[in-house]
Amino acid sequence: MMQEIKAFNEKRAEIYWWLSSLFAKELTQEELDKYQSMEIRAFLTGLAENDALRPSVNAFVDALNRLVDRQDAQLELAADFCDLFLKTAKHGALPYASIYLTKDGLLNGEPAQKMDAWLKKHGVQVNQQLNEPADHLAIMLDFLGNLIIRSNELEQDRHMEEAFIEQNAFIQEMLLSWLPSFSQRAAEYDEFGFYNSAIKLLVAFCMLDSDYLVG
């Protein structure tokens, strides 16, 4: 039983790390090519076997299929990334919790401090290349992947239960508290729909994962 849980933990962490990579930086041509590979397509088909994930996975696959016919796809997708995530909160969907959870909607608010506390508590070093406030979505998802993998060092059922409670608290308080609002913003400004579909998939996966953790 414990081995099954740990094997599933590895899959969960991989999904969060994969999603983190989508929001960390623009995709290179090489990375984009991988999305058309059999390996990635099989991974996405596997995710779509879950009823809760199927609609958002299908939308993401649809965006991938449309990318094949999109002229200068890599450059255009990089422009989408820039317009959505790097410009202004007024005309995009900035990937920081503080934008959505504080009254003034400014960067480096209380959510960034809370995230700093999570990082310090668990001694996790974030990707220094990101050079972003701690409540940047890519950092938060990378951290969650680490939190999950670290729980695989545990051997007793009650310790794993405690780890699940903590992981669920992180998902509910640090992610699902603002991701739906972030998703709405992305839907408004992402005309092509690649990143919008990725965010919808992330929200669906967080909700599914939370259900798994409390189940």
Curated annotation (Swiss-Prot):
GO terms for biological process: protein complex oligomerization; protein folding. It comes from the Bacteria. It is found in: Cytoplasm. Keywords: Chaperone, Cytoplasm. HAMAP family: TorD. Belongs to the TorD/DmsD family. TorD subfamily. Involved in the biogenesis of TorA. Acts on TorA before the insertion of the molybdenum cofactor and, as a result, probably favors a conformation of the apoenzyme that is competent for acquiring the cofactor. This is Chaperone protein TorD. The lineage of its organism: Bacteria, Pseudomonadati, Pseudomonadota, Gammaproteobacteria, Vibrionales.
